[in-house]
């Protein structure tokens, strides 16, 4: 009975210890999560070198899982926007403004269901790529007769791999978007230059035609004046040199 009692106490103690460790682990996770919920840390995170690419993932900006509800997204936005608002961080207003803009942009993007779906598709593509890569590596290890153990078997390392691949995909899409915009802008500029050139050409042609018509009218008037003057001179000349007929003197016998 004593042995049984000791065993029960031991078992109960083990269960209590496991519960305590679970509770302690949860507390540490909460402390870790809350440790970044300071204005300074959030501004630093959102404006660190490379943030222009890190912040392309709206879920990463708001530090939320892709599966969260719209209500949780709104709650997180309010929380972060207050932390990084420039009015609250006047000693670091410029960076606070950049951080606030990143949070605001991510929030608005996730409110748009179409853009949210695109972001989710990128994240899913990153996850599928890592899963495929891990599968191929395991297949190769098995073929070589080696243990089929890879780093990504660790859930945390798998998560990190997905994060890196997802960030890479977001960056590639952003680069392509900028290239497409630059190309479109160049095309619009080229078309505008052609329109301006066509307008200037048409203007030059109109001016030439106008000048030609005016000069033609002038030439016609000059020719008419010339003809009139010439005719007048001829008539005057004819009148000047007109000689009366000779009168034959009558001879008397």
Swiss-Prot record:
Compositional bias per record (Basic and acidic residues), positions renumbered to this chain: 181-222
Q: What does this protein do?
A: Suppresses polyglutamine (polyQ) aggregation of ATXN3 in neuronal cells.
Write down which residues bear the modification named N6-acetyllysine: 146
Where does the UniProt annotation locate this protein? Nucleus
- Which residues fall in a compositionally biased region of kind Basic residues? 231-240
Gene3D superfamilies reported for this sequence? DnaJ domain
Primary localization: nucleus
In Gene Ontology terms, what is one molecular function of this protein? Hsp70 protein binding
Is-annotated flag, keyword Cell inner membrane? Answer: no
Modified-residue entries (N-acetylalanine), positions: 2
The protein's name is DnaJ homolog subfamily C member 8
Q: Where is this region: Essential for polyglutamine aggregation suppression?
A: 232-253
**What InterPro entries does this protein map onto?**
DnaJ_domain, DNAJC8, J_dom_sf
Keywords carried by this UniProt record: Acetylation, Chaperone, Nucleus, Phosphoprotein
Tissue-specific expression? Ubiquitous.
Q: How does it assemble?
A: Interacts with SRPK1. Interacts with HSP70 (HSPA1A or HSPA1B).
Residue positions of motif Nuclear localization signal: 189-192, 203-206
């Amino acid at each position: 009975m004593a042995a049984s009692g000791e065993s029960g106490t031991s078992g109960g103690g083990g269960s209590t210890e496991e519960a305590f460790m679970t509770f302690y682990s949860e507390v540490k996770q909460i402390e870790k999560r809350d440790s970044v919920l300071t204005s300074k840390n959030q501004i630093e995170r959102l404006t660190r070198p490379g943030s222009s690419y890190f912040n392309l993932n709206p879920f990463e900006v708001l530090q939320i899982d892709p599966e969260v509800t719209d209500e949780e997204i709104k709650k997180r936005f309010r929380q972060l926007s207050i932390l990084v608002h420039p009015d609250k961080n006047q000693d670091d207003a410029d960076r606070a403004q950049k951080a606030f803009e990143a949070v605001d942009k991510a929030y608005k993007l996730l409110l748009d269901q179409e853009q949210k779906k695109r972001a989710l598709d990128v994240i899913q593509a990153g996850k599928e790529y890592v899963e495929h890569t891990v599968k191929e590596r395991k297949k190769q290890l098995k073929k070589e007769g080696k243990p089929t153990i890879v780093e990504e078997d660790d859930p945390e390392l798998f998560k990190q791999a997905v994060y890196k691949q997802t960030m890479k995909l977001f960056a590639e899409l952003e680069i392509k978007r900028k290239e497409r915009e630059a190309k479109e802008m160049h095309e619009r500029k080229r078309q505008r230059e052609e329109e301006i050139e066509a307008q200037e050409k048409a203007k030059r042609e109109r001016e030439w035609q106008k000048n030609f018509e005016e000069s033609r009218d002038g030439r016609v008037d000059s020719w008419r004046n010339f003809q009139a003057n010439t005719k007048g001179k001829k008539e005057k000349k004819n009148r000047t040199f007109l000689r009366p007929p000779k009168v034959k003197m009558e001879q008397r016998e």
